[in-house]
């Protein structure tokens, strides 16, 4: 009996594994169907996934717990994502809540810092009013916030209508940028000074045919009133991007932007090179131009695009020939960018200064102070002074009597160790800055605006008994030596070798606030520093 030990016949064709459409599963293959000759038993077979297996995997996935998405910002639409939103959302990685207060750090000139909670739409003027009240300072339109970038040696004064939170949000994270609270006498000087002093005739040119018959004064007045926009032109030294060499170009500031000519003073459009957009940039003063940028002069300024957050790349650094030229370019850039809004800020500042009651009563003044009245105790019984002029005259008489008592006390014989000078009344004045250097006094006056009449008094470093009056005139700081002299046991101070003598420095300053004397101008503004 012979047994058939050969392996059973197995079909490896695709038709055996995947039946034809319409054929129920499990139906045997017809026996008379021949095997395909091209299929070999040693070849691998492709087994397609059946629909039953896919349905089982779907049911298994739905039965598992859902895993939260750790990066929902990447799945949000670009308009709602702070990461995919583009430049408009580059102000911060997290959306800001307009209803929540924001913390702004403000520094004083002595380095002290104070944190202030402000609303999202708080302007620079609102923050200055808060700081003035906290510092117990006199409120006026000269206070301002200065945006400083020490790593770039750049700074600019914020306009009164600018949002402090928006400016701070544009700073690089972890940088050394800061706000500094100080006086800025040059903020509205363009509306107070004469047109010729701020905009020289050689730097103002009208590009419109309608202005050919207008005088220089009328053209400047229209410029200040934002009625027209003439060209500001002049030579500036420009450093190319990525280069350390400075080259002199003839530049033009127009409403459309800042340009420089590649061929002399030509205004042909073929020779004009576009530099920066006025509306999309801010202009800064360069504080350490020689050290950081290798400037040939100390009168540099920078045009920084708003989209630039960090680094030197993209900064357009300019260098002017003198301070008057730089002041003209800075003032024109502000007027071209803000236009009539700048003049509105000036009018609002003037109205607040003339009518302080519109701001409400200061919160630092207690209710009991409002009930105080002027009294006269010169007679046997006190009486209420109802006449305001009489009350003012009595206050002046009391102040003069107090000064006489102080002068009498200072004129008493004292040791020659300088104790009388250390107890002098001038040390309590805001314009007295003690023992600072000549360079430091020039820096302080330059920071608060190079306007005529800005002054301070300091101790002399060469003469231990003398003082120095530092005064700004024609955008230059001049220094006048004040020497003491003694006559009949009394001490006097003089700046003209004893021809005009004063009993103390306070009397000297008050005299030159009303009379020029040997000075080129009156003492108008005192350079002061307030601690926060």
Swiss-Prot record:
It is found in: Cytoplasm; Cell junction, Focal adhesion; Cell membrane; Cytoplasmic granule. Residues 431-527 form the SH2 domain. It comes from the Eukaryota. Changing residue 338 to F: Abolishes Ras activity increase and ERK1/2 phosphorylation. Changing residue 284 to F: Global loss of tyrosine phosphorylation. Abolishes interaction with FHL2 and HAX1. Adapter protein that interacts with the cytoplasmic domain of numerous receptor kinases and modulates down-stream signaling. Promotes activation of down-stream protein kinases, including STAT3, AKT1, MAPK1 and/or MAPK3. Promotes activation of HRAS. Plays a role in signal transduction in response to EGF. Plays a role in the regulation of cell proliferation and cell migration. Plays a role in the assembly and stability of RNA stress granules. Binds to the 5'UTR of target mRNA molecules and represses translation of target mRNA species, when not phosphorylated. This is Growth factor receptor-bound protein 7. It comes from Homo sapiens.
């Amino acid at each position: 009996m012979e047994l058939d030990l050969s392996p059973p016949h197995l079909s490896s064709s695709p038709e055996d594994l995947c039946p034809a459409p319409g054929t129920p599963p499990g139906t045997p293959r017809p026996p008379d169907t021949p095997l395909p000759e091209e299929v070999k038993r040693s070849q691998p077979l492709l087994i397609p996934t059946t629909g039953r297996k896919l349905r089982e995997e779907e049911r298994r996935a739905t039965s598992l717990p859902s895993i939260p998405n750790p990066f929902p910002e990447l799945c949000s639409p670009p308009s709602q994502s702070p990461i995919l939103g583009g430049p408009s959302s580059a102000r911060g990685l997290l959306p800001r809540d307009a209803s929540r207060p924001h913390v702004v750090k403000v520094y004083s000139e002595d380095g002290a810092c104070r944190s202030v909670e402000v609303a999202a739409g708080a302007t620079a003027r609102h923050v200055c009013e808060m700081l003035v009240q906290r510092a117990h300072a006199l409120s006026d339109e000269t206070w301002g916030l200065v945006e400083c970038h020490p790593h770039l040696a750049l700074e600019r004064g914020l306009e009164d209508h600018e949002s402090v939170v928006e400016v701070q949000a544009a700073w690089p994270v972890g940088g050394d940028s800061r706000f500094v609270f100080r006086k800025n006498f040059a903020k509205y000087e363009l509306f107070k000074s004469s047109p010729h002093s701020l905009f020289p005739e050689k730097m103002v040119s009208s590009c419109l045919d309608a202005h050919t018959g207008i005088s220089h004064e009328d053209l400047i007045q229209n410029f200040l009133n934002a009625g027209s926009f003439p060209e500001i032109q002049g030579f500036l030294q420009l450093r190319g991007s990525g280069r350390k060499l400075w080259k002199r170009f003839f530049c033009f500031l127009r409403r459309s932007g800042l340009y420089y000519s590649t061929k002399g003073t030509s205004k042909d459009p073929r020779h004009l090179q576009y530099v920066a957009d006025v509306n999309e940039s801010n202009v800064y003063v360069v504080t350490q131009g020689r050290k950081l940028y290798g400037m040939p002069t100390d009168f540099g300024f920078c045009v920084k695009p708003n989209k630039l957050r960090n680094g030197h790349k993209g900064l357009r650094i300019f260098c002017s020939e003198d301070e008057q030229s730089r002041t003209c370019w800075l003032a024109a850039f502000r007027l071209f960018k803000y236009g009539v809004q700048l003049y509105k800020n000036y009018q609002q500042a003037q109205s607040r200064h003339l009518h302080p009651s519109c701001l409400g009563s200061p919160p630092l003044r207690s209710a009991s102070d409002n009930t105080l009245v002027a009294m006269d105790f010169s007679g046997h019984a006190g009486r209420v002074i109802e006449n305001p002029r009489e009350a003012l005259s009595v206050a002046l008489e009391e102040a003069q009597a107090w000064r006489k008592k102080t002068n009498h006390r200072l004129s008493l014989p004292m040791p020659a160790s300088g104790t009388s000078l250390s107890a002098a009344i001038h040390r309590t004045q805001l314009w007295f800055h003690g023992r600072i250097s000549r360079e430091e006094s020039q820096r302080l006056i330059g920071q608060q605006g190079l306007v005529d009449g800005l002054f301070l008094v300091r101790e002399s470093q060469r003469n231990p008994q003398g003082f120095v009056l530092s005064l700004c005139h024609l955008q230059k700081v001049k220094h006048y030596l004040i020497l003491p002299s003694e006559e009949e046991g009394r001490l006097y101070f003089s700046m003209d070798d004893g021809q005009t003598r004063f009993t103390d420095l306070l009397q000297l300053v008050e005299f030159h606030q009303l009379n020029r004397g040997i000075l080129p101008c009156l003492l108008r503004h005192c350079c002061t520093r307030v601690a926060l």
